[in-house]
Amino acid sequence: MQIKLANPRGFCAGVDRAIEIVNRALDVFGPPIYVRHEVVHNKFVVDNLRQRGAIFVEELDQVPDNVIVIFSAHGVSQAVRKEAEGRGLKVFDATCPLVTKVHMEVVRYSRDGHECVLIGHEGHPEVEGTMGQYDASNGGAIYLVEDEADVAALEVRKPEALHYVTQTTLSMDDTSKVIDALRAKFPQIQGPRKNDICYATQNRQDAVKELADQCDMVLVVGSPNSSNSNRLRELAERMGTPAYLIDGAEDMQRGWFDGVRRIGITAGASAPEVLVRGVIAQLREWGASEEQELEGREENITFSMPKELRVKAL
């Protein structure tokens, strides 16, 4: 069996920053540090931070007074921010800056009283945070659509003042179809100047297409609740290549690889490289040859840390 590795794969700049914020907060202030929602959607990462003293909660009413709280990379609603401020909690915001960009777009449309359509997956924390940026008291409204059927059923009050934004971790191909449907139904709709789907999502989807084209099977390292990891698995399957989403080597079954000559491996943006290495090691034990890394797009984007952690960690 040959092993081919997608490039790029794994951690993006927003995930790197979010994990580092939790680690530095633990270093500087000591445990416990409370984190609202999993800081990133990866079991291995969350378990490691939990062992260091991070406490993960879903709502702020689970957080005692006078503690440090970190908002996850997925972002939070304005209501959550106001609740934290009202309680006087010390907050470090690990929201990915590319998610914050979408939040700012929604706030602007809300302030102008313009209606906004968010393309995204209902129930995902990023979507909940983005929807929660919109203040309908200025006369507008925000609508969530997931697919073309949702667009067909959508009714708005002022199509001449309508905008759309997207969740940052969607399938580019699926999102393009939804945008086309929105433009067909609402010709005056306006989108962001730059695509909201983040650079890392785009790069990893491009890389998995190349990988699936060269392999008999694709393994996507990522947790089941990771949106971008699920999109990678779906994309490989759409290209006709069997694909599995796995948290790590322990999820693999030997029988999957019967008759497989070329195995492709990629990782979602929240999955660390150590998990990929564990998968490779297991495959090598099962007789796979040395891995080959495909050529890909170089990523050199970094995001700065919150000032207080940046100074105190020196």
From Swiss-Prot:
It holds the Pfam family LYTB. Dimethylallyl diphosphate binds at residues 41, 74, 124, 226-228, 270. Isopentenyl diphosphate binds at residues 41, 74, 124, 226-228, 270. The keyword Iron-sulfur applies. Pathway: Isoprenoid biosynthesis; dimethylallyl diphosphate biosynthesis; dimethylallyl diphosphate from (2E)-4-hydroxy-3-methylbutenyl diphosphate: step 1/1; Isoprenoid biosynthesis; isopentenyl diphosphate biosynthesis via DXP pathway; isopentenyl diphosphate from 1-deoxy-D-xylulose 5-phosphate: step 6/6. The active site is at residue 126. It catalyses: isopentenyl diphosphate + 2 oxidized [2Fe-2S]-[ferredoxin] + H2O = (2E)-4-hydroxy-3-methylbut-2-enyl diphosphate + 2 reduced [2Fe-2S]-[ferredoxin] + 2 H(+); dimethylallyl diphosphate + 2 oxidized [2Fe-2S]-[ferredoxin] + H2O = (2E)-4-hydroxy-3-methylbut-2-enyl diphosphate + 2 reduced [2Fe-2S]-[ferredoxin] + 2 H(+). Binds 1 [4Fe-4S] cluster per subunit. [4Fe-4S] cluster binds at residues 12, 96, 198. Its cofactor is [4Fe-4S] cluster. (2E)-4-hydroxy-3-methylbut-2-enyl diphosphate binds at residues 41, 74, 124, 168, 226-228, 270. GO terms for molecular function: 4 iron, 4 sulfur cluster binding; 4-hydroxy-3-methylbut-2-enyl diphosphate reductase activity; metal ion binding. Keywords: 4Fe-4S, Iron, Iron-sulfur, Isoprene biosynthesis, Metal-binding, Oxidoreductase. Its EC number is 1.17.7.4. GO terms for biological process: dimethylallyl diphosphate biosynthetic process; isopentenyl diphosphate biosynthetic process, methylerythritol 4-phosphate pathway; terpenoid biosynthetic process. HAMAP family: IspH (MF_00191). Catalyzes the conversion of 1-hydroxy-2-methyl-2-(E)-butenyl 4-diphosphate (HMBPP) into a mixture of isopentenyl diphosphate (IPP) and dimethylallyl diphosphate (DMAPP). Acts in the terminal step of the DOXP/MEP pathway for isoprenoid precursor biosynthesis. PANTHER family: 4-HYDROXY-3-METHYLBUT-2-ENYL DIPHOSPHATE REDUCTASE (PTHR30426:SF0). Belongs to the IspH family. NCBIfam families: ispH_lytB (TIGR00216), PRK01045.1-2 (NF002188), PRK01045.1-4 (NF002190). This is 4-hydroxy-3-methylbut-2-enyl diphosphate reductase. It comes from Pseudomonas aeruginosa (strain LESB58). The gene is ispH.
